[in-house]
Curated annotation (Swiss-Prot):
Annotated binding of Ca(2+) 1, by residue: D32, N34, N36, Q38, E43
Record Gene3D superfamilies: EF-hand
CDD domains: EFh
Higher taxonomy: Eukaryota, Metazoa, Cnidaria, Hydrozoa, Hydroidolina
Gene name in the database record: MI17
Residues annotated to bind Ca(2+) 2: D125, D127, N129, S131, E136
GO biological process: bioluminescence
Name the UniProt record assigns to this protein: Mitrocomin
Source species: Mitrocoma cellularia
Any GO molecular function: calcium ion binding
Coiled coil: none
Propeptide position ranges: 1-8
SMART domains on file: EFh
Keywords for the protein's UniProt record, in alphabetical order: Calcium, Luminescence, Metal-binding, Photoprotein, Repeat
Role according to the record: Ca(2+)-dependent bioluminescence photoprotein. Displays an emission peak at 470 nm (blue light). Trace amounts of calcium ion trigger the intramolecular oxidation of the chromophore, coelenterazine into coelenteramide and CO(2) with the concomitant emission of light.
Record-stated family: Belongs to the aequorin family.
Length: 198
């Protein structure tokens, strides 16, 4: 299955970049639901399925599809069920995931983040028009707890609306998240409107 992306992204990694490290440290702490300095796949799935999907009103089928994508994505970074992962293990797992995902993207192959994006868009695209509006984006980010202010949501939306049509498609979101989380693409700086560093 080919991604067929319309958008180029920086394909080289910069794992020593303080911005890349700060972004992932922020998310590690955000995802550490019980604040014990360790995370596991149980916590990811609980947050994704029992909190976010439930708040968004996802169907059982949508929740199962989304959960599989979360399992595959975070599994790609080395997370497992019932096995705690520390920060050093987490960041090393992200290095492996980033390399693998960028390699897939460079070959026009489907990435785990794209599969997750497809599953997520199916849930948040409430009017079923194949794109996400600003209001749909705001609802999702509030349910996920990533962004709380409208300004942060609007900043991310504008940053991801690469074709300037006032709506987001999954290709735009995938491209920006590849650049932000994997390669520190300078065109992706400020992606989360300040909710996530840099």
């Amino acid at each position: 299955m080919s991604m067929g992306s319309r958008y180029a992204v920086k394909l080289t990694t910069d794992f020593d970049n303080p911005k890349w490290i700060a972004r992932h440290k922020h998310m590690f702490n955000f995802l550490d639901i019980n604040s014990n300095g360790q995370i596991n796949l149980n916590e990811m799935v609980h947050k994704a399925s029992n909190i976010i999907c439930k708040k968004l009103g996802a169907t059982e089928e949508q929740t199962k599809r989304h959960q599989k994508c979360v399992e595959d994505f975070f599994g790609g970074a080395g997370l497992e069920y019932d096995k705690d992962t520390t920060w050093p293990e987490y960041i090393e797992g992200w290095k492996r995931l980033a390399k693998t995902e960028l390699e897939r993207h460079s070959k026009n192959q489907v990435t785990l983040i794209r599969l997750w994006g497809d599953a997520l868009f199916d849930i948040i695209d409430k009017d079923r028009n194949g794109s996400v509006s600003l209001d749909e984006w705001i609802q999702y980010t509030h349910c996920a707890g990533i962004q709380q202010s409208r300004g942060q949501c609007e900043a991310t939306f504008a940053h991801c609306d690469l074709d300037g049509d006032g709506k987001l498609d999954v290709d735009e979101m995938t491209r920006q998240h590849l650049g932000f989380w994997y390669s520190v693409d300078p065109t992706c700086e400020g992606l989360y409107g300040g909710a996530v560093p840099y």
